[in-house]
């Protein structure tokens, strides 16, 4: 969920195919490739009684990336500890000018007592380089009772987007309005046009089409669990 982190680049890469790299375990460690930035992002580790997390790049062929994160977090019930994620590198684009955001994602989780979500995290602003005003999350999994930000605790709508049923929640996160689409069942092999979710919000929930899409990320937010390994075997996205 949080993405405004100090940019400490662990390495740089060319557009050529990349193989596995050593895991990174620092709070703000990152790895960059031609199109993606992989974050360990332990933004909420202070909420935990104890724990750790490491994230690593497995491969990147220029269009599709594979990566993993291993974590254990205890304490701080109901509080997110981190957001290991991959961000797509692109120029901010006004929603009215978007044609498509095709994405595929194959992932799996192993471990004990997992409370976490697996989600896309998109941000928009009224200008290309302004502060974020909307956060759009697309939850492919709500594990162990994990729940989204919500003003009421109840879904505000149950739309069908991309051929799949979702419960839509809304609430504030600082200065941002957060919309969270939560899948009706865990989806470990996902394919959709993410622009369909943005179109729905513009048409049905009043999000202005003048907003700029500034960030597209995908990853997992742990609340608690032991010896968890989250593996993305294949992930792709583009913005057009």
From Swiss-Prot:
Superkingdom assignment: Eukaryota
Molecular function per GO: cellulase activity; xyloglucan-specific endo-beta-1,4-glucanase activity
Disulfide bonds, paired cysteine numbers: none
Keywords assigned by UniProt, alphabetized: Carbohydrate metabolism, Cell wall biogenesis/degradation, Glycosidase, Hydrolase, Polysaccharide degradation, Secreted, Signal
Gene Ontology cellular component annotations, sorted alphabetically: extracellular region
Top EC category: hydrolase
Record's catalysed reaction(s): xyloglucan + H2O = xyloglucan oligosaccharides
Signal peptide range: 1-15
Main localization category: secreted
EC numbers for this chain: 3.2.1.151
Gene3D superfamilies registered for this protein in UniProt: 2.60.120.180
InterPro entries for the chain: ConA-like_dom_sf, GH11/12, GH12
Record localization: Secreted
GO BP annotation list: cell wall organization; polysaccharide catabolic process
A Pfam family assignment: Glyco_hydro_12
Function recorded in the entry: Catalyzes endohydrolysis of 1,4-beta-D-glucosidic linkages in xyloglucan with retention of the beta-configuration of the glycosyl residues. Specific for xyloglucan and does not hydrolyze other cell wall components.
Family of the protein in this entry: Belongs to the glycosyl hydrolase 12 (cellulase H) family.
Name of the protein in its database record: Probable xyloglucan-specific endo-beta-1,4-glucanase A
Organism per entry: Aspergillus oryzae (strain ATCC 42149 / RIB 40) (Yellow koji mold)
